[in-house]
Structures are given as C-alpha cells and as structure tokens.
Amino acid sequence: MQPLELVKALAAILDSKKAEDLTAIHTTEQTIISDYFLIATGTSSTHVKALADELEYEMKRQYGVLPKGIEGRATGWILLDYGTVLVHIFQREQRDYYNLERLWEDAEKIEL
C-alpha cells in the first residue's frame, strides 16, 4: 500500500469511529521518521483507547496491515507506527499542549 493510500485508509477508519479534527501532514521533506503524520482527537481517554484499538483491528482485518509499534496506551496520547505513517491520537488537552501542527507548520497539509 502506498503511503498516501495508507494515510487515507487510516483516516477513513478513524473518521468512522468519530475521531475529531483529523489532520494529515506530509512530512517527507521535514523528517526521515515517516512520510505522513495523521493526527486525531478523541473525546475522552476511553475514546482515545477505543480509536487506537479499532484502528489496529480494522487495518488488520481490511488490509492485513499491523502497526510496527504502539506507544502510550496508558496516557492521553497514543502513537501507532505504520512505518510510512505515524498516527497520533490525542485527548484534547494533550493535543493542544503538544500542538504538532505548529511544530510541523512548514509541512504540506493533505486533504482527507
């Protein structure tokens, strides 16, 4: 699966589970870490965990794709590493605090 196809598939799953403020950032020119960041907000800690769980489950079920790693399950910020796409799922307070969009403001925003 190409990186842009992957980010759109991930975003569609998160959107179907009522993730808020979905933002995709093309980071290829800014970092070697990944090609894209996908940022989403959950309405509560339970919602954040449910979004991460459903994303992992649906990506495996629909595409046979598993994350290379998952961090932060016990916090308000869960990171799922899909190689070319890093998915950040935040609670509102953590998203506002870390403000990844500002940190990567020079990167291209992708229409979802």
Functional labels for PLM-detected ranges:
Residues 1-33, 45-78, 82-85, 92-94, ...:
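Polybasic/polar functional segments that serve as interface/processing modules
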Residues 39-42:
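Short hydrophobic/aromatic beta-strand micro-patches
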Residues 35-37:
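Catalytic metal-binding acidic patch
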